[in-house]
Regions:
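Residue-level marker of positions within ordered structural domains that often coincide
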Residues: 98, 164, 212
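Short beta-strand edge/turn micro-motifs at domain boundaries
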Residues: 15-21, 29-91, 154-160, 182, ...
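Core segments of small alpha/beta cavity-forming domains
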Residues: 1, 65-135
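Short Pro/Gly-enriched beta-strand edge/turn motifs at strand-loop
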Residues: 3-6, 129-132, 185-190
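Surface-exposed, charged secondary-structure patches
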Residues: 2-35, 134-180
Length: 233
């Protein structure tokens, strides 16, 4: 469930369409973390529709935006004057998810909870798979048409992007590969398990890109990861 109370809404000053609004929810009474919502409006006569949701990390520092009466300018995937364009940053973050510390872009990004949690999950699964001579592989791909950008008052960009991934796991020694989470179980249903399972995910990642000349690193500030298909191979 997405929290309904709004802490801040960043409205674009751009006069044309399509346009996006970034909305930040409050922390709920049961301590659900804040969400960053991206809502799209394709034309003046259409309603805004929810495009993506990212769960903000504990203690995440978001950039500042112009006050609501002024709004903020929407950015573009090729924005210049940054340590990397939004398109480059998203592509490099996908590479970082794929290759971890061995990624050639590892030094460009600050540590974040999404990579930390994903790494722990992968290690836990690996322990079980390796004991039976099984294998696992995750492939991450940035979606060029799935990037939303809002300029911040310090000259940086807040970017929300879709990064798809496919997680293939093969159990060894005649064993069955089973879902790795309740969300995967719900999609797998009553499918007959085989030695290999393939789960496709949509990962929505929010990141801040500092202006050029800054010593700061690109910083992921929130993420949401959900499986969309889980099937036996």
């Amino acid at each position: 469930t997405i929290p309904s109370d709004i802490m801040q809404t960043v409205i674009p000053t751009d006069s044309g369409w399509p346009r996006s609004v970034f909305t930040i929810t409050t922390t709920t009474s049961d301590q659900q973390s804040k969400r960053l919502l991206v809502l799209d409006q394709n034309s003046a006569r259409e309603n805004f529709k929810l495009w993506g949701v990212a769960r903000l990390f504990p203690g995440a520092q978001l950039p500042k935006f112009q006050v609501p009466s002024i709004g903020s300018q929407m950015g573009q995937v090729n924005d210049s004057g940054l340590v990397a364009t939004p398109a480059q940053a998203v592509q490099r973050y996908a590479d970082l998810l794929q290759n971890g510390a061995s990624s050639k872009y590892a030094d460009e990004f600050g540590a974040d909870y999404f990579r930390q949690d994903l790494g722990k999950l992968t290690e836990t699964v690996q322990e079980g798979i390796a004991a039976n001579n099984g294998t696992q592989q995750q492939v991450f791909s940035a979606q060029a048409d799935g990037i939303k950008v809002m300029r911040s008052s310090d000259g940086g960009d807040l970017v929300v992007a879709q990064i798809n991934s496919v997680w293939t796991r093969t159990a060894g020694e005649g064993r069955e590969s089973l879902p790795a989470s309740d969300a995967e179980k719900a999609l797998f249903g009553t499918t007959t398990a085989t030695s290999t399972i393939k789960a496709s995910y949509v990962n929505v990642v929010a990141m801040y890109i500092p202006p050029a000349g800054s010593d700061a690193k690109i910083q992921a500030v929130g993420a949401e990861r959900q499986p969309i298909t889980v099937e036996a191979q």
